[in-house]
Amino acid sequence: MELRTLLNKAIERRHSLAAITNCLRLVNGKGDGCDGLLIDRYHQHVQVQVLHERWSKRVDEIAQILISMMPVDYLIVKSRQGLDLNVKVLKQGDPKTIVEENGLKFEVDLNDGLNCGLFLDMRENRRMVAAACKTKKVFNGFAYTCSFGLYARHYGATEVINTDISKRTLKKAEDNYRLNGFEVSKDEFVTTDTMAYLNRAVKKENFFDIIILDPPSFSRHEGKTFQVKRDMPVLIRTALEVLRPKGRLFVSTNYSEISHAQLEEMLAKSLNTRRVEKLERVGQDQDFPGSNSFKESYLSGLWVKFL
């Protein structure tokens, strides 16, 4: 199939999302018949990720097609070859822009590494979790730019604690809070290791109604390493020690070697005396067709209500 036809078909498939957001994945690799090609739209900014060399020679063509199909203020191509990230800007402009999602605003920066400030695949999960946050005390671990925390505040949470080891990303989170008219409390943004914070919370008997955990596959901080496949059960067990009765846990990973079934096994090993009332498997949003069939588009998540 001609490339223009493939791209147009992929874009049309996502037309219904226009009512709730102006940032979405336009092309999701082989899920859209374009194995090795990812295209994300952030309002009128476009990011193209090239994961296979066959697309490398066609990036100019891809850019021209996209610019002819929609308003584009800025277009950047990111090619991943092993651990190296090669960046090429094909339409110059300000790499920063403000996007909207379910009535909330977020600033993103497409020239800030591979992740620009908002994980698009988590859109529906953010809305789902936030809908349960009214009048609740919420803990958001591995918070990145705190999109879950911002949603929780928007939906009426009485208290939110966001933790992340990166002071820089938490500063971006504070900017997003202000962008949406929320006052920024320094107590709400804690630059710390999430596991360390949870261990302190256990000692202080600092309990939460809702806990959100979306850890990285691997991280290193102050000489300690976190490996999600090794450490997820301990992380969940510690979190459950400070989850109130009738509380809810959202836990997810984009590590392609952990399936939903394996994540459920990790949860089961971590329960101790806790009992599950309801468990729901969740994944990436609808603009990620083919999700979990290839490692570049992967998310296993659980939304759990406890007795």
Feature locations, PLM:
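Non-catalytic accessory regions of SAM-dependent methyltransferases
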Residues: 1-43
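Non-catalytic substrate-recognition/targeting regions of SAM-dependent transferases
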Residues: 27-40, 56-119, 127
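Conserved class I S-adenosyl-L-methionine
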Residues: 135-144
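Conserved SAM-binding loop of SAM-dependent methyltransferases across substrates and taxa
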Residues: 145-157
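Conserved SAM-binding motif I beta-strand of class I
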Residues: 159-164
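S-adenosyl-L-methionine
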Residues: 166-212
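S-adenosylmethionine
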Residues: 194-269
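C-terminal catalytic and target-recognition region of SAM-dependent MTase-like enzymes
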Residues: 248-307
